[in-house]
Structure formats: structure tokens, C-alpha cells
Amino acid sequence: MFNRLFRVCFLAALIMAFTLPNSVYAQKPIFKEVSVHDPSIIETNGTFYVFGSHLASAKSNDLMQWQQLTTSVSNDNPLIPNVYEELKETFEWAQSDTLWAADVTQLADGKYYMYYNACRGDSPRSAMGVAVADNIEGPYKNKGIFLKSGMEGTSSDGTPYDATKHPNVVDPHTFFDKDGKLWMVYGSYSGGIFILEMNPKTGFPLPGQGYGKKLLGGNHSRIEGPYVLYNPDTQYYYLYLSYGGLDATGGYNIRVARSKKPDGPYYDAEGNPMLDVRGKGGTFFDDRSIEPYGVKLMGSYTFETENEKGTGYVSPGHNSAYYDEKTGRSYLIFHTRFPGRGEEHEVRVHQLFMNKDGWPVAAPYRYAGETLKEVKQKDITGTYKLIQHGKDISADIKQTINIQLNKNHTISGEMTGTWRKTGKNTADITLAGKKYNGVFLRQWDSVREKNVMTFSVLNTSGEAVWGSK
């Protein structure tokens, strides 16, 4: 009887040992998609919200399953009911019937402050203001415009408006620094990216700043969508930016620079001052002058191979970012288009990790609840699909090449080099003589519907490389 019972228990334990990993680690995550262009994230009461252009918004409890709340500017939109009357001055000034990228923050009074903006589109004629609500889902009531651009004559800083030097007043992001001061970074193309110190009680800029302090850009260089996130572990402020054009052929890509102070100066991984980054005088959209600068986290790519359908993005950009103080995890939230789908776009979230040089690297696949855990060498070795994001601003979609990470720590295949696991999950990789560092991470591949080993690494030139086994 005892022997029979022992055999039954042993067999049950053996079955569990072989089946449990599949149920735990290969369970298919559930995603629900939404479309919010230029998503700016805020967390409140355990729920994540994103607000974007055209008064679009969505919410999620887990950053994976999203619920669309609003989609377009109309008088029926519950965020700002009767919006064309409520923001009449804004629409009239901008000569527009829509709104651009919004940002929402909560101030000490518990109220939610929505920074809205409208732009004519073919010129930097724009207006920016703030509306306030007791509930994050609205209704928001207008408190007024505080910045205008694109005017003929005197600008907000008291000098004649010059579109090569002065900002286009769109794409705001408000944030608190580590000392509790409130700031707003903003700007798109035209004269560049600027920052203002804000009144934390009123939500308006402190007086006497004009357009504020310039951080980078100018001469109509294609830089926009600024977003600042402080990381208490590295004690740096990270300024995220989008370079290029937002459409499927515009070469949109996500970059980052950092500073020890919220208002700069900001530098890239090579130590270049971002204040000097701009197009040449007398030019429009001079991408060649700006593309060497800033750490490029991702651009257009596909993990597609010869024998299987892959996954990829086209013109990912206009991101926000979130740091979870409880877990210490960071996330990159952005919109993206997709190969073969034209101008359709959806929100995506990728986890961020800091490499040993204090720069963020983005997980190759979308966030599916994964955590950074210890990995073993035997799980790392094998054949990988490799993406090199480079530094260019281009409509080209980066394609994969194949490499092998061998047991003897060499790399062979279409590129050669070396690799080493330097900690529980940290990666040192050399490819074609360039040194990269970052992380090894097991992630969910939604095309093959299984967990795979990946790596995300960055070199000192600010070039990101991803691998997927």
C-alpha cells in the first residue's frame, strides 16, 4: 500500500514538474488595443490613463489591456463637453478644428490639470492653455491660454516672433522634480524644445519667463514630443524626444538625453550638449544635422525572418514614460504604426531597464507582465534575430540578421563578436568591434506565442541593438 501510494505521489509530482513551467511561463497574455496618438501617461488610484491628440484617451489596470474612453474632438466628448465653445479662443487663434497632444497632471489640490494645445499645422501658429477637472475623466473646464506662437509681431518673450528661434507652443509635458518644483517642457520643430517653471498652485507658468529656457533644436529641425522622467536610482532626469516625421514614411524614432538638473543642460551618451543640436541656418527639416545626436532607443524595424511572419513597428514615437516607485520598474509608452498597415496606429508599452552606464534600454517586445530575473548561460546560447537601430532618421524599416551566441562566449553568423553575462541578467556584448551593455530578459513573443530569451543593449555612441532567440 505504501509503495503504491509512493509511486502515485511520485508520478503526480513528476507530471507537475514537467507541466507547471508551461502553465506559468508560457501562458498567453491578453492584450486589448487602443488608438491614442501621442499618449501621455498618468497613474491615479491604481489606474493608468493615457491622453493624446484629438482629445483621445484610454485607461488600463495592467498596461496590457486598454479600454478606449474617447477618440476625437467633438462637443459630445466627455473630457471637455461643448469643446468648441469652451476652447473657442484656442481654435480661433490656431485656425484649427482639432487639438494636438494633451498632458494631464494632478496638483496638490487634488484636481487634474489638462494642458491642451492647438496648431494650424502648416505653420507654428499655436495656442496652449490649461483646463481643470475634479475627476480625471472630466469634465474639464477651461482656465485660459498662457502661450501663443506663430504671430506676426511681438511674441511671448517681447521680441518679434522668429520661427527658427522661438518655439511652436505644442506638445506639453508637466512634471515635478525631486525637490517638488513643477516644470513644463514643450515644443515641436520650429525653434526647438523649451522648458518653463510652473506655479504648483495655479498650474500656470511663473511670470517673467517668456517662452522659458531653450533645451535643444531650432531652424525647423524635426524634434518634438519632449517628456522628462526622473530616475531616483541614477539621479538623472531623462529627456525623451521624437526625431523625424510622425507618419509611416517619416522615420519617427525615440531618443533620450539626460541631465542632473530638470532644466538642463542635457547631454547624450557621447557627452554632446543637446543645446547645440539643430538644423543648419536657412534649412527646413535638416535631418542629417541632428541624427548623430541623442541616444536612439528605437525606430522602425521588423523581427521578420524568411520562414515566419514577424512583428515590428513603423515610426514609433511621441512617447511618455512612467517610473513605479513601489517596484522600481520603468515603462516606455508610445504610439506606433505597423508594417503593411499604413497610417493605423496603436498604443504600445515596453519595459525600460538601466544599463551599467545609467542609460535606459527598451525591452525588444511589448510589456506582457515580465520581470527581470536571473538567467542561466544554457538559456542564452543559441541563434538570435538581431536588430540594429542605428542613429539614422529614415523611412527604411530595419531588418533582422541572424547571429549565434556560442557556448565559448563568441558570436558568429552574419556578425561576429563576443558576449558575456556579467551579473544575474546583465549583458556585455561586442559586435563588429563595438561594445554594448544592457540586459538579458525572457519575454513573450506574440507571433510565435511563446516565451523567448532576448537581449537589449546600448553602446557609448547611443546605438541600440536588440536580439530575440
From Swiss-Prot:
Pathway: Glycan metabolism; L-arabinan degradation. Substrate binds at residues 38, 122, 168-171, 188-190, 220-224. The active site is at 38 (proton acceptor), 224 (proton donor). The keyword Signal applies. It catalyses: Endohydrolysis of (1->5)-alpha-arabinofuranosidic linkages in (1->5)-arabinans. Homodimer. This is Extracellular endo-alpha-(1->5)-L-arabinanase 2.
